């Protein structure tokens, strides 16, 4: 595939070669998002576990929408900004909750919202590592993070977290002339306790696990998420820039304490 094909996505058949820099970059953009500029969304459903010395205990469920705002491909890189909006829910219901009975501490916890972004990502072809089994292809994106996980960013204690996102699809879908393809996302995140769980004196970590799919329209969004986003009234789904100031679930919680 030549540069013109890369920029237009105009190729068909069995020509895609993931060992080629231009093909790999095109396939990456198409699998994760779009080979053209525009927005794509993932609906995520997951569970947070308390990972204790005695084993893992399910704490709470969560649902969110992950938004990628993709820029047009160039010869060297692909770029996008990401945002996330969502909520926590009980283990037996998909409806949002603002507090829950922590099964580890037997205390009532007041919860935050799930919110993140804008996060900017730029990736070149030499950073992309494909795995393939028959028609199945996937990419892993491990990420070690270092930061302050307590109730204040002024806490001198630096701790580590680890996230791994996996995007999986079909080579045959990447090989057509469309600008986007179906994708399944698996997300895993291990970190110190977030302060709203009030477990800073308990040995262990929290483990977030979620699975989601790339969706094509608002009608594909689960009703509980539609209702949540409508109540937020920030046009999250339709806007390419739903908010300006960078935040995270942890920072959003900290900011809420100051209001």
Please annotate each region the language model reported.
Residues 154, 159-163, 168, 172-208, ...:
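Domain-length functional cores that host ligand/cofactor binding and catalytic or interaction surfaces
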Residues 190-259:
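Edge beta-strand at a domain terminus
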Residues 1-12:
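N-terminal secretory signal peptides and thylakoid transit peptides that target proteins
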Residues 51:
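Short, solvent-exposed loop/turn elements at domain surfaces
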Residues 55-183:
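Predominantly extracellular/secreted and cell-surface proteins with exposed
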């Amino acid at each position: 595939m030549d540069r013109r094909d890369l920029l237009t996505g105009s190729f068909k058949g069995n020509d895609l070669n993931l060992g080629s820099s231009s093909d790999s970059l095109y396939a990456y953009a198409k699998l994760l998002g779009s080979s053209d500029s525009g927005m794509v969304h993932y609906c995520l459903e997951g569970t947070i576990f308390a990972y204790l010395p005695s084993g893992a205990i399910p704490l709470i469920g969560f649902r969110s929408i992950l938004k990628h705002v993709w820029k047009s491909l160039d010869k060297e890189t692909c770029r996008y900004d990401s945002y996330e909006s969502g909520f926590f829910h009980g283990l037996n219901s998909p409806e949002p909750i603002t507090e829950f009975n922590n099964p580890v501490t037997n205390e009532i916890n007041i919860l935050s919202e799930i919110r993140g972004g804008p996060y900017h990502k730029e990736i070149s072809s030499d950073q992309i590592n494909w795995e393939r089994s028959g028609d199945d292809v996937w990419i892993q994106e491990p990420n070690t993070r270092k930061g302050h996980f307590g109730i204040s960013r002024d806490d001198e204690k630096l701790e580590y977290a680890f996230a791994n996102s996996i995007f999986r699809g079909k080579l045959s879908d990447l090989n057509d002339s469309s600008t986007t393809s179906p994708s399944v996302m698996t997300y895993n995140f291990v970190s110190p306790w977030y302060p709203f769980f009030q477990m800073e004196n308990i040995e262990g970590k929290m483990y977030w696990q979620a699975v989601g799919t790339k969706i094509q329209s608002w009608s594909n969004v689960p009703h509980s998420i539609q209702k949540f986003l409508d109540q937020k009234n920030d046009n999250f789904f339709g806007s390419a820039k739903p908010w300006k100031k960078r935040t995270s679930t942890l920072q959003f919680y900290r900011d809420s304490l100051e209001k």
